[in-house]
Amino acid sequence: MSDGRGNLELDVSRETLERLMVFSEVLKKWNPKINLVSRKSIDDLWTRHILDSIQVFDAAPEGGAWLDIGSGGGLPGIIVAILAAEKSPDTRITLMESDLRKCAFLRNAARECGVSVTVKSKRIESAPEENCDVLSARALADLDNLLGFAERHLAENGTAMFPKGANWKKEVDNARKRWRFECDEITSVTEPGAVILKIKGVERV
């Protein structure tokens, strides 16, 4: 039976690959009930979503406390937890999601994959400050709003990891009207013109 990866080659251990495969099956099982990812993209789950999440982990600093906000379908949060179990076991991962059904999915997916995460059912803008070392968000909001969440939840020397599509330059220019920040753009391997924005030093203008 096909696992949906096609010819995709991943530089991970057999155990990590097995966990990723378990995650893909759990997501496909839950998706019709609570729409974790679009039906259009579910057939391209490995390259569109899983590989996209892997590159976020690979570009981020190692260790410390990692907060994924608007975790929804566990992308990148559960993928980060799967990779960290092998490559960075000291990383403490928190997934923040306001939808209770999606929180139930996240807990189930973590359990099925055998990884440790803390799932918090809270609204990002009103949750207590997390003081995390790494903050990630995927397909959640525009950069201006994401930087507001980063200012609230990142530790002083923390790093934000935000995958963005081909219009990322406009988002950066717009965000600079209200924010000062250092930004590295890492070219995405999953979508032409897309990047991962690696951001530090967030403060209001």
UniProtKB/Swiss-Prot annotation:
Binding site for S-adenosyl-L-methionine: G70, L75, I124, E125, R138
GO cellular component: cytosol
Keyword Cytoplasm: yes
A Pfam family that the UniProt record links to this protein: GidB
Keywords: Cytoplasm, Methyltransferase, rRNA processing, S-adenosyl-L-methionine, Transferase
InterPro entries per the UniProt record, alphabetical: rRNA_ssu_MeTfrase_G, SAM-dependent_MTases_sf
Single GO MF annotation: rRNA (guanine-N7-)-methyltransferase activity
Reaction(s) the record says it catalyses: guanosine(527) in 16S rRNA + S-adenosyl-L-methionine = N(7)-methylguanosine(527) in 16S rRNA + S-adenosyl-L-homocysteine
Subcellular location, principal: cytoplasm
Subcellular location: Cytoplasm
Physiological role: Specifically methylates the N7 position of guanine in position 527 of 16S rRNA.
PANTHER family per record: S-ADENOSYL-L-METHIONINE-DEPENDENT METHYLTRANSFERASES SUPERFAMILY PROTEIN (PTHR31760:SF0)
Family statement drawn from the similarity comment of this UniProt entry: Belongs to the methyltransferase superfamily. RNA methyltransferase RsmG family.
Protein name: Ribosomal RNA small subunit methyltransferase G
Species, as recorded: Ruegeria sp. (strain TM1040)
